[in-house]
């Protein structure tokens, strides 16, 4: 049974890879690195177009996908079509060229986790979170050429960006025409996004997407932006 949240359409010259959903770290997750990387290794096309609409997920799983794309022999073009938030914003930067739809959204913030244990366990977890942040800062800094302290503060603040803003910071290279936001946003719980601390400009983008249009029966299932209680305790997410 094909994976519902990522799809690969291979052709001789160009292959399209669609990453729509939560980025996990096991075979049970919507976008799991093992299946995706196994399929990427079989692609012989000269160009890979990666289409992203994702709320993020596992730091470890996302880093594995980022590295697989970055090290692939093909020329990688990334297209942010709806949302590239959290770990998805890292995967997007694996592209040799990064395109972002004019009505798409880009977000960066700090890794988070939760669990149980004594004070020593939580100190170790805090150290792991600090280490994870440094690995992400390496990627953001390399792509954007922004000062590391500036990016770190943006992560601390949880920064949401329009395409114009993301391009201004150097995270994306080109702004492309609007995509059908209504179709893209059905993959994400847009109401959960609008309930977050978004700038008014980004809330307007969500409203403009006409997300309440009748479903044509062909869209993928809506998947809510995961809460901390829904994630595995032992993993670090972003």
PLM region descriptions:
Residues 1-87, 95-236:
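N-terminal organellar transit peptides
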């Amino acid at each position: 049974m094909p994976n519902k949240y990522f799809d690969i359409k291979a052709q001789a010259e160009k292959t399209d890879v669609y990453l729509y959903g939560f980025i996990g770290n096991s075979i049970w997750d919507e976008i799991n690195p093992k299946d995706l990387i196994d399929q990427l290794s079989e692609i012989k096309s000269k160009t890979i177009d990666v289409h992203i609409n994702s709320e993020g997920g596992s730091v470890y799983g996302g880093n594995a996908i980022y590295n697989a794309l970055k090290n692939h022999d093909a020329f990688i073009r990334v297209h942010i079509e709806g949302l590239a938030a959290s770990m998805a914003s890292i995967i997007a930067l694996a592209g040799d060229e990064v395109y972002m739809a004019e009505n798409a959204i880009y977000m960066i913030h700090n890794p988070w986790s939760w669990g149980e244990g004594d004070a020593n366990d939580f100190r170790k977890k805090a150290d792991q979170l600090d280490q994870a942040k440094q690995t992400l800062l390496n990627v953001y800094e390399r792509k954007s050429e922004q000062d590391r302290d500036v990016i770190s503060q943006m992560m601390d603040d949880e920064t949401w960006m329009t395409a114009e803003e993301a391009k201004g910071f150097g995270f994306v290279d080109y702004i492309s025409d609007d995509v059908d936001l209504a179709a893209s946003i059905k993959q994400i719980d847009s109401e959960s996004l609008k309930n977050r601390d978004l700038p008014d400009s980004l809330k307007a983008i969500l409203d403009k997407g006409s997300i309440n249009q009748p479903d044509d029966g062909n869209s993928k299932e809506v998947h809510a932006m995961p809460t901390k209680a829904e994630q595995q305790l032992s993993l670090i997410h972003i």
